[in-house]
Amino acid sequence: MNPPHEFAVSGSDTRYVGRVVALRLDHVVMPGGRTTEREVVEHPGSVVVLPLHDDASVVMIDQYRHPLGRRIRELPAGLLDAPGEDPVTTARRELVEEVGYLARDWSVLVDLVASPGFSDEAVRVFLACGLTEVGRPPGGDDEEADLHVVRLPLAEAVRQVLTGEIVNASAVAGLLAAHAVLAGPGLGPSLIGPSLIGPSLIGPAELRPVDAPWPDRPTRFADRRGGTPP
């Protein structure tokens, strides 16, 4: 059996560098020796927070997204664009800024890569429990000045995922993962009280600590901007 092919990069050209993304053109060696071009959108990465109340309700936001030209329902989130700031610190800050909550207990819920066919964007979704409402800070710029905070049962949010009302990829992943976690044996009561929402799927060992390894976290954009991730 032949060893797996190593897709070496023989050259790379930067085509655009913006505030949030960069575009580069890589020349990649394919099996058989042919070289082809691959467009890569570099992204700083982002964090998402699923704030879960003791009654199994979640806090979400309705926010305008210009590429879609409409408001969509999402979880609180933010870019990993602060030099030297670790992901959970960014997540804590975004939770306060976007929905006005502090959380006592944090864990990694799920990691995902958004569009690996053309982008290195990766997202880490945190589960935040033990919530205390402190209010959003005054101000807010651009789209954030218009966002609306909503609280709804997790079961209703999952229903909206399945009916196509919630389409944000990280929200879909986070909500379905939370549904699975709460259905796990012994885990639901320890997080949110006695009410479970489905059959057992996974156990408590599946939740990871906030500093769990994240091998797909992007670094190229941060390196380009002079802020290598911690």
Regions found by a protein language model. Give the residues of each.
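Conserved Nudix-box catalytic region and its N-terminal flanking loop in Nudix hydrolases
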Residues: 2-6, 48-93, 135, 141-144, ...
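Nudix hydrolase/Nudix homology domain
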Residues: 2-7, 34, 108, 116-119, ...
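Active-site segment of metal-dependent pyrophosphate-handling enzymes
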Residues: 22, 44, 52-53, 65-67, ...
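Conserved hydrophobic/aromatic beta-strand scaffold that supports enzyme active sites
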Residues: 23-27, 50, 60, 125-127, ...
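Terminal peptide-recognition signature
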Residues: 26, 56, 95, 153
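Short, well-structured alpha-helical patches and their helix-loop capping segments
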Residues: 83, 87, 91, 114-118, ...
